From Swiss-Prot:
Protein encoded by which gene: ATP6
Protein name: ATP synthase subunit a
Lineage of origin: Eukaryota, Viridiplantae, Streptophyta, Embryophyta, Tracheophyta
InterPro entries named in the record: ATP_synth_F0_asu (IPR000568), ATP_synth_F0_asu_AS (IPR023011), ATP_synth_F0_asu_bact/mt (IPR045083), F0_ATP_A_sf (IPR035908)
Pfam families registered for this protein in UniProt: ATP-synt_A
SUPFAM superfamilies: F1F0 ATP synthase subunit A
Record-linked HAMAP family: ATP_synth_a_bact (MF_01393)
Length: 395
């Protein structure tokens, strides 16, 4: 369902006058599904509950514009609903000329894709500037609906499954001979590098535990690191989708990690885990304020981790798309001066692509470091790992 804006005159909105005048003064927002109500179409009482005085002429305009969009959708089965909407709006231009709208609809119905109206819609929609945020659009691949709940299989679900399958296949082929080769090949070296890369922050950032206990956290952290490592640069591949560019996905990932770390803190320290909310020696009157000040930043860890990853991925990929489109536009110009000057934007796009690839990989590393720091805070109640190293040297 799409929210549309149509122009009507003030008289048509406030009365049931059947005469139609030029629309120029006010706007009203409607939902397209309102047009499906057969008992309200063509009646002077109006088809919209927010404007009961909408006259039949204005209703007819809305019906014709809606029918044009439906007909274009039938003629463009491979295009998305958003593309069909853009083509229909470019064709009729939100016109309030009933004769013109009837002509467009009649041409689409009689001539189809060979008609002048369809060709104009396709040509006009090509001239529209595409948004750099279109790459983050969620598309329903397999629609599924149970009651009022939607369980559609979308493109983020597809690429998450592809990422999971790729990681599992990589690990399977490396370990299928019972632990790998004594002389590692390139793929085995990659898996071992990922494992060592995660193990080092675990040993450095988490203190107060033996090495064997620390390594119990390594598989869980490795899964998070590997998922981010493969999902973040995924959007740099043409016609792919950046899973971590959506806030709900990154928030779900960070929130689940936050809950797990909190559970580990309670398992390790019991109710004494809550002592980090109130430092020792604080006067009693200040206790409520300090508890609140400590609790808010602690809870915001889940939110900040999700926002950081989402914002970096969306901003970086959008910048690459904008500059790439700019460079391509200059390259397509026939002027020699533009072609020579286009080398600058091309180099900028190349440098920005490398920078975005580095940011995508570094975000996985940053997430791993933060998880280890949060784990250390939960286990040792905000005592750094260096404190335990100094204590061990003293002993």
């Amino acid at each position: 369902m799409f929210r549309r804006i149509f122009l009507f005159d003030e008289d048509s909105l406030n009365s049931s006058v059947t005469s139609y005048t030029n629309a120029s003064q006010s706007t009203t927002t409607i939902m397209d599904y309102s047009l499906k109500s057969s008992d309200t179409q063509g009646s002077s009482s109006g088809i919209f509950t927010d404007h009961p005085g909408l006259n039949p002429c204005s209703e007819r305009i809305v019906e014709l514009q809606y029918d044009i969009r439906l007909k274009l959708g039938a003629l463009m089965p491979k295009e998305s609903a958003q593309k069909v909407l853009e083509a229909s709006e470019a064709l009729h231009g939100e016109s309030n000329n009933i004769a013109f709208l009837e002509y467009l609809l009649e041409d689409l119905q009689q001539n189809g894709v060979g008609g002048e109206a369809y060709k104009d819609a396709v040509d006009l929609s090509k001239d529209l500037v595409s948004s750099p945020l279109e790459q983050f659009e969620i598309i329903s691949l397999i629609p599924m609906k149970i009651g009022n709940l939607y369980f559609s299989f979308t493109n983020p679900s597809l690429f998450m499954l592809l990422t999971l399958s790729l990681v599992l296949l990589l690990v399977y082929f490396v370990t299928k001979k019972g632990g790998g080769n004594s002389v590692p090949n390139a793929w085995q070296s990659l898996v071992e590098l990922i494992y060592d890369f995660v193990l080092n922050p675990v040993n450095e950032q988490i203190g107060g535990l033996s090495g064997n206990v620390k390594q119990k956290f390594s598989p869980r952290i490795s899964v998070t690191f590997t998922f981010s490592l493969f999902c973040n640069p995924q959007g740099m591949i043409p016609y792919s989708f950046t899973v971590t560019s959506h806030f709900l996905i990154t928030l779900g990932l960070s929130f689940s990690i936050f809950i797990g770390i909190t559970i580990v803190g309670f398992q390790k320290n019991g109710l004494h885990f809550l002592s980090f909310l109130l430092p020792a020696g604080v006067p009693l009157p200040l206790a409520p304020f300090l508890v609140l000040l400590e609790l808010i930043p602690y809870c915001f860890r889940a939110l900040s981790s999700g926002i950081r990853l989402f914002a970096n991925m969306m901003a970086g990929h959008s910048s690459v798309k904008i500059l790439s489109g700019f460079a391509w536009t200059m390259l397509c110009m026939n002027d020699l001066l533009y072609f020579i000057g286009d080398l600058g934007p091309l180099f900028i796009v190349l440098a920005l692509t490398g920078l975005e690839l580095g940011v995508a990989i570094s975000q996985a590393h940053v997430s791993t470091i933060l998880i280890c720091i949060y784990l250390n805070d939960a286990i040792n109640l905000h005592q750094s790992a260096s404190f335990f190293i100094i204590e061990q040297k003293r002993v």
